[in-house]
């Protein structure tokens, strides 16, 4: 499939009746009494507003019935409410609904504001995980962990060399990373991603060889039910792999 065919496939999913299509189409919530936000790091989406473990077998620390899935950084979501203590927001993402820690969300004006921030080229994380270098001037991006499938807007064309917080961007991509301000609102801060990192500009070509290579990058890591333990379960593995080709 070409990039154009993948885009048409993504659009066609909105036409399939059922809950999955309803979730994918966040635009249906425009104009309603909802707030909007963006994940500022990989975070958990929970069935209830608590981070307490709820294993189906007593003492099993690899299981949690309340863990639904993981949300990658820079994912938009509709905010439908919050817990009594304000620690969790009830959200809808493009593929799941549940509760997300409020500290992992940056508030934005609306879905269009997020889309505007994504305009232009983007960098796709194609490695299992990419960890950014330490930044003593901007702790919100320092050492940021970016899982496979994460998409970040480019802040400049590849090859651009300029100063950023005391460093020159030689051999780095310049990207915009979502962060949460002190007042809870979303802000994008520039950061550097080394050209040696396992990333690509745009999406990978959708070939059998590339799909196999992407899946192989996760061999041997811990199975994480719903994204627990920093790992992936079966659906997250498939989802993160296919995001690298532009599938939603």
Model-derived segments and their meaning:
Residues 68-70:
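Signature of short aromatic-glycine-proline-rich micro-motifs recurring in repeat-based ectodomains
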Residues 66, 161-163, 225-227:
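Generic recognition of flexible, low-complexity loop/linker segments
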Residues 208-248:
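Catalytic cores of peptidoglycan-degrading enzymes
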Residues 1-46, 50-62, 72, 76-78, ...:
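Boundary regions of SH3-family modules and the immediately adjacent low-complexity/disordered segments
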